[in-house]
From Swiss-Prot:
Record GO terms (molecular function): 3-isopropylmalate dehydratase activity
Function: Catalyzes the isomerization between 2-isopropylmalate and 3-isopropylmalate, via the formation of 2-isopropylmaleate.
Quaternary structure note: Heterodimer of LeuC and LeuD.
EC number(s) from the headed UniProt entry: 4.2.1.33
Gene Ontology biological-process entries: L-leucine biosynthetic process
Organism (species): Shouchella clausii (strain KSM-K16) (Alkalihalobacillus clausii)
Highest taxon above the source species: Bacteria
Protein name according to UniProt: 3-isopropylmalate dehydratase small subunit
UniProt-listed Pfam families: Aconitase_C
């Protein structure tokens, strides 16, 4: 996984609540197990019309959303069924940070495990950053080490579990984290095999 220490990027606002994983990536696109190639299906039913043409009213289809890597959205983002394809699609599309007042628990964990930084802010702070992103195309800086979001004088502190922070900051998934203890694991296995003889 790519580490996230300081991320600078343009933000796009998707001011909706209870966006579920089927809206993030519809079930008909879940037939593969590779993590790549899902970005093209992100928010498919909202991004495209029935004939396959872009939906000109959808937020991500607006010119100012092009190249955005920070998504600011509403309460309970990622609710619904547990599908790891949802963070895969967000990541593959180009998002690295998602800011919302709340996330579904399993979705939140899947984000971190797949290199996305989910940030919980209060509803008021989220609204403030939504307004800022709508007003300005200036990049927002997210500093994971300092747990700080900032742009042009506005700063907001955010909380994050130290375990998840360490995973994202170092670019570790669960396998690479386990490999940090490979020597200790080998010693333990050696001791256990000696005891069990």
């Amino acid at each position: 996984m790519e580490p996230i220490q300081v991320h600078k990027g343009k933000a796009v606002v998707l001011d909706r609540v209870n966006i579920d994983t089927d809206q993030i990536i519809p079930k008909q696109f879940l037939k593969r197990v590779e993590r790549t190639g899902f970005g093209q299906y992100l928010f498919y039913d909202w991004r495209f019309q029935a004939d396959g043409a872009d939906n000109p009213a959808f937020e991500l289809n607006q010119p100012e959303a092009n190249g955005a890597s920070i998504l600011i959205t509403g309460h309970n983002f990622g609710c619904g069924s547990s599908r790891e394809h949802a963070p895969w699609a967000l990541y593959d599309y180009g998002f690295r940070v998602i800011i919302a007042p709340s996330f579904a628990d399993i979705f939140y964990n899947n984000c971190v495990k797949n290199g996305l930084l989910p940030i919980r802010l209060s509803p008021e702070e989220t609204e403030l950053w939504m307004e800022r992103a709508k007003e300005s195309q200036e990049e927002i800086t997210v500093d994971l080490g300092e747990q700080l979001i900032k742009q042009n004088g506005l700063e907001t502190k955010f909380e994050m579990d130290s375990y998840w922070k360490q995973m994202l900051y170092n670019g570790w998934d669960e396998i690479s984290l386990t490999l940090q203890y490979e020597e200790a694991i080998a010693k333990y296995e050696h001791r256990q095999s000696a005891v069990n003889k």
